[in-house]
A protein has these predicted regions:
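Extracellular structured ligand-interaction cores
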Residues: 25-27, 76
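C-terminal terminal-subdomain/extension
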Residues: 63-165
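Compact nucleic-acid interaction/catalytic patches
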Residues: 23-24, 34-72
Length: 165
């Protein structure tokens, strides 16, 4: 979580895990893609009522299960650079000792993972196109760039972290 806070210090578009706004327990869960030979984590978000009226765009995708029920979204605009040192696997297996809430969360994560696996090529393509727009031609689509993380700036934070170890 320290890495996420380091990123958030240099870019307000990074999804917060700050204790000041009661987000310290929010997991940063996402799908890892490779853009420009760099690993990026595209954050997943749980379904919210506002997502029903939102349309898929260059920086946003809704995920639906086989019954066409909204199961979550991918926020490409909030993707962050990662390396193996900041990635942790998630135990998505349902255990008897899991609470009802944990079981529901793991079921949701499994549904989201199924959707992501079924749409992996489109996810990677969308992430890389967005990366290229924001990192290489930010003036081309200013409104889009404004709501996205500054990928190049965040890459410097990751590089600094790597060099300090």
């Amino acid at each position: 979580m320290k890495y996420i806070r380091d990123l958030a210090r240099v870019d307000d578009n990074v999804m917060s895990v700050s204790p000041q706004i009661r987000k310290e327990n929010r997991p940063f869960v996402g799908i890892v893609v490779i853009c420009d030979n760099k690993k990026y984590c595209v954050p997943l978000t749980s379904p919210k009522p506002k997502h029903m009226s939102m349309k898929n765009d260059k920086d946003f995708s809704r995920m639906f299960d086989k019954d066409n029920k909204l199961i979550g979204c991918l926020n490409f605009n909030n993707m962050i650079p990662v390396d193996d040192s900041v990635l942790l696997p998630i135990d998505m297996e349902v255990h008897k000792s899991d609470s009802i809430g944990e079981q529901a969360y793991k079921a949701l994560l499994n549904d989201q993972l199924d959707w992501c696996n079924d749409n992996l090529e489109a996810i990677t393509s969308k992430a890389c196109k967005l990366y290229k727009i924001v990192a290489e031609t930010p003036d081309k689509m200013k409104n889009l760039t404004r709501r996205c993380c500054d990928f190049k700036n965040l890459e410097q934070v990751l590089e600094k972290r790597k060099n300090s170890k």
